[in-house]
Curated annotation (Swiss-Prot):
Expressed predominantly in liver, and at lower level in skeletal muscle. Disulfide bonds join C249-C321. It holds the Pfam family Aa_trans. The gene is Slc38a4. This is Sodium-coupled neutral amino acid transporter 4. GO terms for biological process: amino acid transmembrane transport; L-alanine import across plasma membrane; L-alanine transmembrane transport; L-arginine transmembrane transport; neutral amino acid transport. GO terms for cellular component: microvillus membrane; plasma membrane. Residues 1-104, 173-195, 242-332, 391-411, 475-476, 536-547 are extracellular. Belongs to the amino acid/polyamine transporter 2 family. The record marks C232 as: Influences on amino acid transport capacity.
Amino acid sequence: MDPIELRSVNIEPYEDSCSVDSIQSCYTGMGNSEKGAMDSQFANEDAESQKFLTNGFLGKKTLTDYADEHHPGTTSFGMSSFNLSNAIMGSGILGLSYAMANTGIVLFVIMLLTVAILSLYSVHLLLKTAKEGGSLIYEKLGEKAFGWPGKIGAFISITMQNIGAMSSYLFIIKYELPEVIRVFMGLEENTGEWYLNGNYLVLFVSVGIILPLSLLKNLGYLGYTSGFSLTCMVFFVSVVIYKKFQIPCPLPVLDHNNGNLTFNNTLPMHVIMLPNNSESTGMNFMVDYTHRDPEGLDEKPAAGPLHGSGVEYEAHSGDKCQPKYFVFNSRTAYAIPILAFAFVCHPEVLPIYSELKDRSRRKMQTVSNISITGMLVMYLLAALFGYLSFYGEVEDELLHAYSKVYTFDTALLMVRLAVLVAVTLTVPIVLFPIRTSVITLLFPRRPFSWVKHFGIAAIIIALNNVLVILVPTIKYIFGFIGASSATMLIFILPAAFYLKLVKKEPLRSPQKIGALVFLVTGIIFMMGSMALIIIDWIYNPPNPDHH
């Protein structure tokens, strides 16, 4: 009997409960590979700290057979809400301002609300399917619905989503670690030395920190970093709101090659400095002194981007500092995938549901409502104030945009350090379920092997590093993963599983019709987004110098 399957068994209290030390003797029918994964993940860890380190392995409490949906869980309502919020929150928040800049405020808010509501409906379908299908494992639901192809489809979608998350975390290291080192060394600009090269740094961090942590058998203690990760994102949003009222508009025209302020001789300019509550730091920039158009001047965009800045600064235009409410361009295609990437939490919904104390579908739906609503508010604040800080000059990774304005800033340095520590410690947690799924799929019922344990981790990390080094910007990760695996996990798979496994509702019932419409909507979103992204790649090929 599968230890995590929902079966109709005797629901008398389970007196001979298996302890962690006797897992192997209690489950002799379980493959050695699976036992090794479970023993390594959950030894000496309580249910609160286990959280959701893997997709499907639910902790030592869940190693007993679940009698039915009302088998008592161990995790409180509040902790479950916190866990799901942390599962939703991720690096996607850093790309939302870029999405708003390429959709406009009104269109972005409509799309954000739409994706949030659809995510809630998707969770509803998933919870109902789990009950009717009799499983709390995403891949197992796929197998029950469509056999081996369904299992592989769910496996590929979850693996791609986790690889996308890993790559986005490594991108943040590549973007932000050089800035942190530059500030600590007191350099005005990135001089191009090897220790300021993001490609080298991400390799060093991967080999020196991430790989050793990924080789540990027990990663349970890293689950506590999820709380730190969520806290640092709250701090990040607070700093974004605060900095909105410090950054002027138009943006400063800075020559990053010479480290000096430059200006157009035809426009009256003057130098000012904004303090950042630090004695030795500040923000220098040039602004139009008169804030009016000099007579006889025909303002045109500056000739090309400033070298090394990654941002094209234009001469002051009338609407440069006016927010746009509706925007359509080639980059608008990235908006829905970025939003989908930001709201994916579905592989973690079932493990969290299984551990919810006195659980019911209604209670878990309430947990989902609270978590997604909370993240919706944070996403909206981060996107809005990040966009209003830079308008059309916002970058696809918001933190990196601030380095174009601030040379040294204590608050931003603290945010960068917090985010770097959080994402570095999160990568092994994301890697662990990928490795477990690969071992289970390729080496079923094989004994634990350190060679496989090390080799698969090294291959996954190496592939992610190659991806991060070769792909010029994080928006391509957000876009491609959001349009493919995120759309599969939010829209297509839950609806398809529901239509196939929930037998008691007729096909023409409102519930089934709604699920069918949801499925078709997901397919349209995926095909449309992928087509537009590919068109953007063709007509606006990636710039290898962008970083």
